[in-house]
Amino acid sequence: MYVATSKQMKAYDQALLNKGYKIEELVDKASDAILPHCRDYDKIVIVCGPGNNGADGLSLGIKLHLRARKIKLYCFGNPNKLSKANDYYIGQAQEIGVPITFMDDDDIQLFINDARKADVVIDAMFGFGLNSEVRGIAKTLVNEINNLYNVDIISIDIP
């Protein structure tokens, strides 16, 4: 396992982008890194934030869906403020029929019910770019995920 600060990770991402990589390529690399850790799970819930970490989760959801896993994607955040990569992968997921719920406060119980029935919940809410206190629906989701005792949890970037 490698450990890096958020500053180091931002610099690494920027160096790759400067070399000509597209953000979608970085997202695919991130989801490829998580994919082997999901091989033993069939029922998978992925909760995605509005940024590139959410895009990592969306990309992973697509790959798992194509491997015939039972995937449920939950996305939150202002639809007008999604990262470019997040918006791209939402479109890709919708195109192939991956079930996506665009959450608001009324969908929390639906998420909880699905999460409790899952083999694993994948947290793709926030990445190393998080620089503020978690609040609103995200805070509620973090608390609910922390209360899942009989379900495995995998966090992409930061738990």
Give the residues covered by each predicted segment.
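Glycine-rich phosphate/dinucleotide-binding loop and adjoining beta-alpha-beta core of small-molecule
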Residues: 1-4, 41-159
